Regions:
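Glycine-rich loop at the start of a catalytic domain that most often binds anionic cofactors/ligands
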Residues: 64-68
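Acidic, metal-binding active-site segment of PIN/NYN-like and related structure-specific nucleases
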Residues: 43-63
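Short beta->alpha connector loops at strand-helix junctions that form conserved
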Residues: 27, 54, 74-76
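Generic secondary-structure boundary/loop-capping signal
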Residues: 28-31, 57, 61, 71, ...
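Short glycine-/acidic-enriched loop or helix-start segments at secondary-structure transitions
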Residues: 14-15, 61-63, 83
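Alpha-helix N-cap/helix-start and coil->helix boundary motif
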Residues: 10-11, 57-58, 79
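C-terminal structural segments of small proteins and small subunits
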Residues: 69-109
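N-terminal first-folded block
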Residues: 1-49
């Protein structure tokens, strides 16, 4: 699948996904300044299938009904906190289907 990382998603996570997915960062596309709705629009238009984000409020800020892109929300943005939960993150990305939403709980500290 074609996976997009938003600005808060640690790039180190990509190495755990690249064997099955193509991963691109929003900043690599020049999308680092886009707000959530516009980022979702651009990502869908470009053919991205999954957005990995650290924005836990995304589902409350955007109407996700009818979206083709799947969204995986990480509970934290710091790699040191995500790393012990990388298996769950990879599983959530692998299980993503068009329009799906998943949140991977990552406790702080």
């Amino acid at each position: 699948m074609l996976v997009l990382f938003d600005n808060g998603t640690p790039r180190t996570l990509a190495r755990y996904l690249i064997d099955r997915h193509t991963v691109t960062e929003a900043r690599a596309r020049g999308w680092e300044e886009l707000e959530n709705g516009e980022l979702l629009n651009q990502a869908e238009a470009a053919g991205f299938e999954v957005l990995v984000t650290t924005d836990k409020n995304l589902r409350y800020q955007q109407n996700l009904t009818g979206r083709r892109i799947a969204i995986v929300v990480l509970g934290q943005g710091r790699w040191t906190l995500i790393q012990p939960h990388v298996t769950q993150v990879v599983a959530a990305v692998n299980a993503a289907t068009p329009g799906s939403f998943a949140e991977v709980e990552i406790p702080y500290g």
